Amino acid sequence: MEGETSWISHCPDYVAPDMVEFDSFSELNDEDNGEASLVPVDLILPDDLLERILAYLPIASIFRAGCVCKRWYEIVKSTRFLWNFSQVLSQKPWYFMFTSSEEPVGYAYDPSLRKWYGVELPCIQTSNWFIASSCGLVCFMDNDSRSELYVCNPITKCYKSLDEPPGLKFSDYSALAISVNKKTCCYSVTIIKSKQVPGNFFQWDLAIHIYDSGKMMWVTPLTEVLTGWRGGDESVICDGVLYFLIYSTGGGGPDNRHGLITYNLSSRSSHGLLIRSFIPVPCSLTCGRLMNLKEKLVMVGGIGKPDRPDIIKGIGIWELNGKEWQEIARMPHKYFQGFGEFDDVFASSGTDDLIYIQSYGAPALLVFDVKQKQWRWSQKCPVTKRFPLQLFTGFCFEPRLEMAP
């Protein structure tokens, strides 16, 4: 299909070198009557210098480089090369778009090269699983029993299965988050479970479960009953603090349907009410999506109409400073219209300086560069909508080679 590139075709483990074409290095030699003579790179550069050069290539180009020859293949697979790669500035985050509701298949978008790659995700079975990512690792949790948990690197396909979290086996709502410590390469996974108190719609049991990869164990530092609010499926970890959205169960006005709760993962206090950390959302929202941009909490939200708060009229982006929201951007109307019919809920995720926004009803993908304040459509995804009720969703992740669960 036009515009599609198979990610597997770039992986030296799966493809023979003669399947990929490369340009040769050449220079003009006056002594040979102006004819070009090939100059093998192997004779010019020592291993350590070649490793540093290759480490600055985009991810896809690194896999292509591994197909050039045996020497280059061994270099890109070496531990020293992975260390060099880890010292290079992070690659721009990619966006994986699911193209089926039944199977975990789709394409990953590279904003640097503006290309889509066919990527096969390990572990995950359907696109409706819970997904969270941090620093090259992605965490999956099944949506049925919520007992299957995996942490993987979607680029290298390395993965690890986590033990089932403690507490309630079944919950009405769950929120998943992961945070990787770049210095130690250890990670924390949090699951917030929310379940209605039997016979009381206004009261909801809420529990926070934390997995520490260093200790390889779960702890449940907090359980609490919320009145008038319930947990949902939005959470993220920024600079050691767990943020999650809560939703009104009735009694509040139309401007008070969402709220934000914070929980410090370092202190892990089990005392005091969570509701004391309540932070109101900046305006009436149809939905909110939380993300970590350089350890700052950013929320992308659908802005509701004043007279019909459940009807979306636009999309805003806010950053949390202390307990105050600061609007950093609002989607221009031409891009909002460019999605066509836009539902009151939508997919959005981001990291570093990029935010991706996607309508569930179409494969169109909009990218916002926070640093440059620039909106831009992605290259067209190599998939078309086959039937009216077909849904599209996805998630953002950092493409990294050196991270392993």
Pin down the residues of each PLM region.
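Short, conserved recognition motifs on repeat-domain binding surfaces
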Residues: 1-405
